[in-house]
Swiss-Prot record:
InterPro entries cross-referenced by the UniProt entry: BRCT_dom, BRCT_dom_sf, PES
Residue ranges of coiled coil: 298-327, 568-676
UniProt biased composition (Basic and acidic residues): 579-608, 620-631, 643-659, 666-676
Quaternary context: Component of the NOP7 complex, composed of ERB1, NOP7 and YTM1. The complex is held together by ERB1, which interacts with NOP7 via its N-terminal domain and with YTM1 via a high-affinity interaction between the seven-bladed beta-propeller domains of the 2 proteins. The NOP7 complex associates with the 66S pre-ribosome.
Listed name of the protein: Pescadillo homolog
Family named by the database record: Belongs to the pescadillo family.
Length: 676
């Protein structure tokens, strides 16, 4: 018995997906409202595996959604708000058409519905951890809008809201010492904080003048900002209440107008808020003598207990001195050079959180004040000062304050003679910036702060002195793998066997070529002075022939004149080595017969490097041959997989080799400049 035939497009993939046009008709809303609703609800387009089946044979470009998602939107309360908004907009349009501007303003003020997203936040994030996991994009978007200028597309009210929410979040990070890492990149400054076990990473743009292009759809971005501001408001409230702070914190509008930023917010504990009236008159309160006597008695009992605890602690310390101290953090070291790198246990986060606690910083006018203030305070520093021109809220605005221990500057050192142009004696050493350094004060560049927090310790400040060549600023989230180039390690520890000698010979060849070019240029200058008809250092007539010769030589021998390893070249090398050994033995016999001493020439550096390279090239060829023999035992599928793996490894090795070669050139140039 044949089964019942099904109508095409009523089951399977065609039923699981729905086009955007059909979805808009089904919800009976406009396309902008549909986009806005999908952003609020977290519904995004889907890509079916077989578009032809879903679109019933059509190949036109179409946007698809899950049918269940659109069915889920049918019960959304915001649909009624959108329809009500549309109805009020029609009434306002008719009032404006009649010229009744007052009635239109009254209708907009009284009848325009207010869209609230509280229920959507609760639906999308059932737990607080879910909200923290989705906070990365929210913070990046809000920090971006907080630094944008107001325009027709971005109202100043939205920018002020983003600034308030982001600074409230920064205050929580400072109070809880949740900041872990930061990185200066081309896009902006990356921050990573750990809140309730969740790593949150966001991007803050640099404070340059932002120019918004005309190809940006601010309606879509504004919808995201509307949702993210609601989300961050919920998160800030939960975070503040979890540490016993009142939300929202007090806001000083006057300080904010003067550029106070973080200083414009005053945090307040719940106990202080409830007892604020009584705290204002603490001096007028009379002390109860009976209560004071009981408090003194309890304090005396606590002192006796403390003395006993101190004696017991001293006895325990004497016993511990006799034994080996095993309370330190264990370090897991690999047993073999090719073993896996084990994650090491870290020190207490409390020590890192108070990294800058004992110091007083002063920020120069040219450094990024907002980011440095946030980082320094997040890592325990309570005293950060800057020039009064940078804004309100500084610990001190006096650069000569004796309490300052560190000054962060980012000015290039003045060249000799620039600071004293009217000096009579040119041989006298000139004063460089800073003209008057304060004794006992450390001058560093801003990168010192970022590198210290990323490594979790205070680094040497002399490496970051003003005008010094800074160490490489590396991303704290990217760890170099085996075989990759690591700027922190010395070059000799990363180069494979024989590579240093090869680089040295190539550098010598480059220097020789450079000297030849210099000689040709000098000849051209001399010829130019004597005659105009000379080719000015260029071989004009023979250029075509040279190009042909070069192309032929490149085609025959490759870019470096290397034609590969074959049996004939190996045989020639063996014959030459045997002939050289025979001639050397013959000279030794002749010297022994005549009674003369054989003059042994010491090999040159180039010959030594060539011998070392030859040795390791031979070893490398043997390894490649063994690898090829092992490949022959693999199946075709595994051989293709191995080929893809080798392609990635070769690409990584080539990039690492280029970086090592570049570093070798830079180090040689630096050494030559120092010698000069």
């Amino acid at each position: 018995m044949a089964g019942r035939s099904k109508k095409k497009g009523t089951s399977g993939a065609a039923k699981n997906y729905i086009t955007r046009t059909r979805a808009v008709k089904k919800l009976q809303i406009s396309l902008p409202d549909f986009r806005r609703l999908c952003i609020f609800k977290g519904i995004y387009p889907r890509e079916p595996r077989n578009k032809k089946k879903v679109s019933k044979g059509s190949t036109a470009q179409t946007t698809f959604y899950y049918t269940k998602d659109i069915q889920y939107l049918l019960h959304e309360p915001l649909l009624a708000k959108f329809r009500e908004h549309k109805s009020v907009a029609k009434k306002i349009g008719r009032a404006l058409g009649r010229g009744e501007a007052g009635d239109a303003a009254r209708l907009e003020k009284n009848l325009m519905p207010k869209v609230k997203l509280d229920h959507i936040i609760k639906e999308r994030y059932p737990t607080f951890v879910d909200a923290l996991r989705d906070l990365d994009d929210a913070l990046s978007m809000l920090f971006l809008f907080a630094n944008l200028p107001s325009s027709d597309h971005i109202p100043a009210k939205t920018i002020a809201l983003c600034q308030r929410l982001t600074r409230e979040f920064e205050h929580y990070v400072i109070t809880s010492h949740a900041l872990r890492k930061s990185f200066l990149s081309i896009k902006g400054i990356y921050y990573q904080a750990t809140i309730q076990g969740q790593d949150i990473l966001w991007l803050v743009p640099y404070r340059f003048v932002q120019r918004t292009g005309g190809d940006i759809d601010f309606r879509i971005m504004g919808t995201f900002v509307e949702f993210y501001t609601t989300l961050l408001g919920f998160v800030n409230y939960r975070l503040y209440t979890s540490v016993g702070l009142v939300y929202p914190p007090k806001f000083n509008a006057k300080s904010d107008e003067q550029g106070g930023e973080l200083a414009a917010f005053q945090l307040e504990g719940k106990a202080n808020a409830t007892n604020g009236a009584s705290n204002d008159h603490d001096d007028d309160v009379e002390i109860n003598p009976e209560a004071q006597a009981k408090a003194d008695k309890i304090a005396a009992m606590a002192d006796d207990e403390d003395e006993q605890e101190v004696e017991m602690a001293e006895a325990d310390a004497e016993d511990d001195d006799e034994e080996e101290n095993t309370e330190g953090i264990d370090k897991f070291e690999p047993t073999a050079p090719d073993a896996d790198i084990l994650p090491q246990p870290q020190a207490s986060s409390a020590e890192i959180a108070s990294l800058f606690a004992p110091f007083t910083f002063y920020l120069a006018r040219e450094v990024p004040r907002a980011s440095l203030e946030f980082i320094l305070k997040a890592f325990g520093c309570k005293r950060v000062g800057w020039d009064s021109i940078l804004g309100d809220g500084a610990f001190t605005t006096n650069e000569s304050d004796p309490n300052i221990t560190h000054q962060i500057v980012d000015r290039p050192p003045l060249a000799n003679g620039a600071s004293a142009a009217g000096a009579e004696d040119a041989a006298t050493p000139q004063v460089q910036w800073p003209h008057s350094t304060k004794p006992g004060r450390t001058y560093v560049q801003p990168q010192w702060v970022w590198d210290c927090i990323n490594q979790g310790k205070l680094l040497r400040p002399d490496l970051y002195a003003p005008g010094a060549e800074l160490p490489p600023h590396l991303s704290p989230w990217v760890k170099p793998k085996k075989g990759e180039y690591d700027p922190n390690l010395p070059l000799a520890a990363q180069q494979p066997d024989g590579e240093a000698e090869a680089f040295e010979d190539l550098a010598d060849e480059d220097e020789d070529a450079f000297e030849v070019d210099d000689d040709e240029d000098m000849d051209a200058v001399a010829d130019r002075e004597g005659s105009v008809e000379v080719g000015e250092g260029m071989d004009v007539a023979d250029s075509d022939d040279d190009d042909e010769d070069d192309s032929e030589s490149d085609a025959e021998g490759g870019a470096d004149g290397f034609a590969g390893f074959d049996d004939e070249s190996e045989a020639e090398s063996d014959i030459s080595e045997g002939e050289a050994a025979r001639l050397q033995h013959q000279r030794e016999l002749e010297a022994e017969a005549t009674g003369k001493k054989l003059d042994v020439k010491a090999p040159t550096k180039k010959e030594q490097n060539a011998a070392i390279r030859k040795k390791f090239d031979k070893k490398k060829r043997a390894e490649e041959e063994e690898r090829d023999r092992q490949k022959m035992m693999l199946s075709n599928k595994k051989r293709k997989l191995l080929k893809r793996i080798e392609y990635g490894e070769n690409k990584r090795d080539t990039e690492s080799e280029n970086l090592r070669r570049k570093r070798t050139r830079l180090e040689k140039a630096k050494a030559a400049a120092e010698r000069a």
